[in-house]
């Protein structure tokens, strides 16, 4: 009988850690002929491969990594993730690995903090990798996708009643600099969970959060880290931080590494993953920088013409897959430059994603939190996630009626500024009263106030009772009979 090596599993684990990102070098070159921004151009390269990873050793011995972006005969253009400062054309050594960019993934990543390239920065050991996955992900067969139908209760009335989020949806927060989008995202992460129906047992879900920050300042990174630690969810969070002083080019791979980790947690570990990406505007600007360095023909406002396709490769990595228990729900945050919703970044994002949550500066200036303007906000998958058996049978009607009354109230408010309050009819005054109370009682709530969807609907009914019953034209008579009388919504 052959002797069994008891150290074999340990040796295997050791090699897994040591291997980490390293791939055996294929060919070594010292033929750098030019450096342009984040790009390095090499001459006399034999058989370079598109998207191949290149290990770069600088004259001082420090190592960087890059990716082949372009190939022309025997020339290769390499994008360096850590930046090109200090690269010397004569003494820089480039190793072509013959492999694409892979990231080590494991369930042990939860509770850890990584930099934008996926390397640990929390003074902990390297991740004991269960697998090395391509950061561009596996394409999901559209036929295998499951339509998102379970509503995520965020505890925020303006989202739960008016723009319900389904598990597996991708819905961005459209914000601007100086607005509390980070606080809203943290509140959604803190309070998010399935709707608990009264007649069903309480469900404990297998929940995880993947948070990727691109180009954020230290204060934002500290805010999220502290918030996760304070509410006790840090052991279920995987943080990827590319700060404002980190290399710009690293921002291009940060969301992809984060989503690769999320896909592993969702489809292999059967977890329901919430992915928060902030700030997508920094990502798009990094894309523009690379495009300008490659001297490509620019599109609108200098952004590359392929930005729509590139953003889709990130946003489309959300959803549910048949035969797998996990799901990925995406909440990207983007800051609109100059509060302009027609800017290419929010414009293209809105085309790809399934709605948007619009954070409004005027509401914020009036000290309303969360300053979510429900009129330009939208959730395209709301209709399939609400109603009898999922939330409550009156949900859709209440939402429509609140929208209608709020929109009319806004028109009346604009008219009042022109003609004065004396010229308004009694109906107009009712809409004005509704407008004030809607913003004060329905939209406004505390940072730690967690309202169930049923509480939010009841507040909606309290506001609708401002109007006589015959003015509520968007709610069927049978629903009015059940919920319009005082106390009806509570029963």
Swiss-Prot record:
Disruption phenotype: RNAi-mediated knockdown causes hyperfusion of embryonic epidermal cells. RNAi-mediated knockdown suppresses hypoxia-induced cell death, and, in a mec-4 (u231) mutant background, neurodegeneration of touch-receptor neurons. ATP binds at residue 380. CDD domains: ATP-synt_V_A-type_beta_C, ATP-synt_V_A-type_beta_N, V_A-ATPase_B. Keywords: ATP-binding, Hydrogen ion transport, Ion transport, Nucleotide-binding, Transport. InterPro entries: ATP-synt_VA_C, ATPase_a/bsu_AS, ATPase_F1/V1/A1_a/bsu_N, ATPase_F1/V1/A1_a/bsu_nucl-bd, ATPase_V1-cplx_bsu, P-loop_NTPase, V-ATPase_su_B/beta. GO terms for cellular component: proton-transporting V-type ATPase, V1 domain. Gene3D superfamilies: 3.40.50.12240. Expressed ubiquitously. Highly expressed in the H-shaped excretory cell, the excretory pore, the intestine, and hypodermal cells. Expressed in the nervous system. Expressed at low levels in muscles. The keyword Lyase does not apply. It holds the Pfam family ATP-synt_VA_C. GO terms for molecular function: ATP binding; proton-transporting ATPase activity, rotational mechanism. GO terms for biological process: ATP metabolic process; cell-cell adhesion; energy coupled proton transmembrane transport, against electrochemical gradient; positive regulation of apoptotic process involved in development; positive regulation of neurotransmitter secretion; positive regulation of programmed cell death; proton transmembrane transport; regulation of intracellular pH. Non-catalytic subunit of the V1 complex of vacuolar(H+)-ATPase (V-ATPase), a multisubunit enzyme composed of a peripheral complex (V1) that hydrolyzes ATP and a membrane integral complex (V0) that translocates protons. V-ATPase is responsible for acidifying and maintaining the pH of intracellular compartments and in some cell types, is targeted to the plasma membrane, where it is responsible for acidifying the extracellular environment. Essential for the proper assembly and activity of V-ATPase. Required maternally for early embryogenesis and zygotically during morphogenesis. V-ATPase is a heteromultimeric enzyme made up of two complexes: the ATP-hydrolytic V1 complex and the proton translocation V0 complex. The V1 complex consists of three catalytic AB heterodimers that form a heterohexamer, three peripheral stalks each consisting of EG heterodimers, one central rotor including subunits D and F, and the regulatory subunits C and H. The proton translocation complex V0 consists of the proton transport subunit a, a ring of proteolipid subunits c9c'', rotary subunit d, subunits e and f, and the accessory subunits vah-19/Ac45 and vah-20/PRR. Belongs to the ATPase alpha/beta chains family. HAMAP family: ATP_synth_B_arch. This is V-type proton ATPase subunit B 1. The lineage of its organism: Eukaryota, Metazoa, Ecdysozoa, Nematoda, Chromadorea.
């Amino acid at each position: 009988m052959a002797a069994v090596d008891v150290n074999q599993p340990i040796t295997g684990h050791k090699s897994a850690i040591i291997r980490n990102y390293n791939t055996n070098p294929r060919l070594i070159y010292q033929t750098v002929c030019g450096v342009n921004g984040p790009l390095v151009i090499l001459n006399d390269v034999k058989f370079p491969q598109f998207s191949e990873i290149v290990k770069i050793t600088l004259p001082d011995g420090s190592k960087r990594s890059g990716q082949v972006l372009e190939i022309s005969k025997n020339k290769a253009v390499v994008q360096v993730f850590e930046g090109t400062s200090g690269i010397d054309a004569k003494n820089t050594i480039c190793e072509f690995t013959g492999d694409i960019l892979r990231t080590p993934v494991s369930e042990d990543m939860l509770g850890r903090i990584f930099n934008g390239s996926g390397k640990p920065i929390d003074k902990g050991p390297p991740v004991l990798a269960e697998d090395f996955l391509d950061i561009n992900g596996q394409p999901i067969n559209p036929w295998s996708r499951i339509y998102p139908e379970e509503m995520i209760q965020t505890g925020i009335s303006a989202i739960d009643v008016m723009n319900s989020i389904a598990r597996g949806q991708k819905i961005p927060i459209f914000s601007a600099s100086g607005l509390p989008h980070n606080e809203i995202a943290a509140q959604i992460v803190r309070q998010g969970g399935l709707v608990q129906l009264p007649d069903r047992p309480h469900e404990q879900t297998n929940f995880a959060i993947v948070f990727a920050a691109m180009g954020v300042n230290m204060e934002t990174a500290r805010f999220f880290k502290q918030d996760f630690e304070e509410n006790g969810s840090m052991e279920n969070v995987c943080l990827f931080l590319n700060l404002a002083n980190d290399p710009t080019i690293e921002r291009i791979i940060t969301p992809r590494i984060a989503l690769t980790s999320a896909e592993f947690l969702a489809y292999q570990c059967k977890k329901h993953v919430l992915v928060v990406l902030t700030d997508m505007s920094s990502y798009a600007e990094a894309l523009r920088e690379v495009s300008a360095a490659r001297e490509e023909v620019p599109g609108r406002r200098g952004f590359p013409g392929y930005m729509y396709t590139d953003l889709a490769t990130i946003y489309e990595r959300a959803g549910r897959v048949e035969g797998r228990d996990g799901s990925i729900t995406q909440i990207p945050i983007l800051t609109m430059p100059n509060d302009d919703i027609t800017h290419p970044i929010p414009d293209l994002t809105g085309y790809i994603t399934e709605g948007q949550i619009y954070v409004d500066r005027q509401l914020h200036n009036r000290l309303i939190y969360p300053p979510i303007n429900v009129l330009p906000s939208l959730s395209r998958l709301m209709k399939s996630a609400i109603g009898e058996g999922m939330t409550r049978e009156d949900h859709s009607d209440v939402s429509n009626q609140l929208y209608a009354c709020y929109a009319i109230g806004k028109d009346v408010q604009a008219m009042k500024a022109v003609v004065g309050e004396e010229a308004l009819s009694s109906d107009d005054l009712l809409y004005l009263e509704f407008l004030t109370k809607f913003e004060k009682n329905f939209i406004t709530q505390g940072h730690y106030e967690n309202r169930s969807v049923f509480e939010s609907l009841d507040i909606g009914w309290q506001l609708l009772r401002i109007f006589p019953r015959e003015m509520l034209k968007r709610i069927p008579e049978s629903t009015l009979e059940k919920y319009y009388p005082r106390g009806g919504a509570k029963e």
